[in-house]
Amino acid sequence: MNRKLCAPADRAQSWESIDWKKAEAYVKKLQMRIVKAQKDGHYNKVKTLQWLLTHSFYAKALAVKRVTSNKGKNTAGVDHELWKTPKGKFEAIEKLKRRGYKPQPLRRVYIPKKNGKLRPLSIPTMTDRAMQTLYKFALEPLAETLADPNS
């Protein structure tokens, strides 16, 4: 049996070819479906939609984009790994898998305060930050739905 392995047609093949508007729309749509399922009391559907979101290529791509474009993008964790190149960012998307994932220890840095003392700062690895962002995408709609409307 001679089979050809191909990537799905709608999935990007490189960092530069990712359609960011489509990715944001996909994640936003899944988040809205999570909110609707929560309001309707369909908790199994909420869980299923959260699973879909955390395993989707677009959500992983947005998580990596967010981590690599924020203020701490040049601060490495204990693994001293930074995702600066488009190739490195695309490989990071592929690495964001729950199976076998184990968070790394935090890198501890002490930064000076105004009074001369030092304040501890814990820095996670890029992979840990991206994984946190990915799961934030799935949990944030619930937090907003269940939060106090006056807060």
Residue ranges and their predicted role:
Residues 1-25:
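Intrinsically disordered, low-complexity and often Lys/Arg-enriched segments
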Residues 22, 30, 34-151:
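Conserved pre-catalytic core of RNA-dependent polymerases
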